[in-house]
Structures are given as structure tokens and as C-alpha cells.
Amino acid sequence: MANEITWRLEHEKIGRLLLHYAMPAVIGTMVNALYNIVDRIFIGQGVGPLAMAGLTLTFPILLFLQAFGMLIGAGAATRVSIYLGRRENEMAEKVLGNAFTLTFIITLATVVPCMIWMKDLLLAFGGSEQTIPYAQDYLNIVVPGTLLTSLSFGFNAVMRASGYPKKAMFTMLIGAITNVILDPIFIFWLDMGIKGAAIATIISMLLCTLFVMNHFVQKDSIVRFHKGTFKLEKHVVWNILTIGVSPFALSLIRISEPT
């Protein structure tokens, strides 16, 4: 499989390669948007307008946390692609392992403050006594699960960049379809309201993460996890962050945009 991917990148026409890699990426981005759309539909119908207002309050916090996932995921995906193009597979695997460790560290460093000052942040975003409880119910479940979000989306980008765009797309589809199935079960059937929507999201992210992580331990993957690659190396971390900082900054700008 690895040799086939390398051959395609070296010999196929640029236009065909662009289509091969771009279309699954576009579909994956649309699928990503489904998480928010589906949650809004079911929460609006099953819980009510105050819950919808509470859900809207959560977006700046969630976008902030997702920006750090973008910082690592986009940077790692690009670096892996560069090293594979140079036939430096060992360096590509170092990037993979360092990105995994870095995701854990940065997630912990951002999630803990968000949990501690959650109510203060929601008040700053214009929350009221009526809407903040809904926002807290959602965030108390979703924020601790940020690690799953960062791993699933970030390493999905690495999977795509390393030559598996269709597999990356199907992995995202699995998560989105699971979310669509579980939302009505938890919100309506189990009568868990906005908490049910949060649980459905986390379960779908867990499933997506398991599929992505499983890919990088398979023998047919062009880059794989190895014990020696998880130890952080300054130059590897620097290489990841210098590329990831641009999409990270753009993600932060989105938070300040009026909705």
C-alpha cells in the first residue's frame, strides 16, 4: 500500500491527484459541520429556545479549544507530507509521535482553565441565569472530551496527508452518522436534554478517534506509531508549530467575528 501511494504521487497527473485528495477533504469538512447542525436541530426541537441560546454561548469556548487541535493537526499533517515527499519516513513518524504527545499536553493545559473559569467565561459572552445552566450542562461533558476532538480531527488530517484521503473521509462519516443516530436516542428517548446531545457527540468522537488511532498501528500504514517517537524533540515540535500557527490564528479570528 505504501509503495502504491508513493507511485501515485510521483506519476499521476496533478489534476487527478488534486481531485483525489481535495474532494474527500471537502466532504470531511462538510461532515464536521454536521455535528453542530444536528445538535442544533435536535436541541431546538427537543429542549427549547433557552437551550439553543445556551448552546450558542458554548461556541467561543469550543472554537478556542479546537484552534489548538488545529495548531497541532494542521502542522503535523503538513510536516508528515513534506517528509514523506523527501522519503524521510523516520522523520515523518517522529512528527506523528510528537504530535500525539503534544496533543495530550496542550489539551490538558487548555481544558483545565476552561473548566475552572467556565461560568465567568459564559458571563463574559453574555450568558444569563436562564441560559448559563444549559451551556454548563453541555460544556461539562464536551470540554473534558476535547482530547477526543483534537485526536480525531487532527490525526484525520495526518491520515489524509499521508495518502489515505478516502479512509479519512469515511472515518469522519462514521462519527457523524453515529452522532445523528444517538442524538434523538439521548435527547428524546432517554429524555436527557442538552446533556444527551453532549454525550452523543462525545461517543461519536470516541468512535472516530478509535478508527483514526487504529490506522496508525496497522502494518499497511505508510507512517505508524513507534515507542521511540513519543518523546518530544524541540526541532520536531518547532516544525509542527511553525506551520500550524497560521490555521491556529485564523481559528482564533473566527471567535471574534460577529455571528
Task: For the regions a language model picked out, list residue spans one by one.
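Residue-level signal for short hydrophobic patches within transmembrane helices
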Residues: 15-34, 38, 61-68, 144, ...
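Hydrophobic/aromatic residues in alpha-helical transmembrane segments
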Residues: 23, 39, 76, 117-118, ...
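Helix-loop interface residues and adjacent transmembrane-helix termini in multi-pass membrane transporters
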Residues: 37, 46-49, 83-86, 161-162, ...
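Small-residue-rich hydrophobic transmembrane alpha-helices
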Residues: 52-112, 149-168
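Hydrophobic transmembrane alpha-helices of multi-pass small-molecule transporters
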Residues: 64-67, 111, 179-184, 209-213
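Alpha-helical transmembrane segments of multi-pass membrane transporters/permeases
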Residues: 103, 158-182, 199-202
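Residue-level detector of conserved catalytic or cofactor/ligand-binding positions
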Residues: 251-253, 257-259
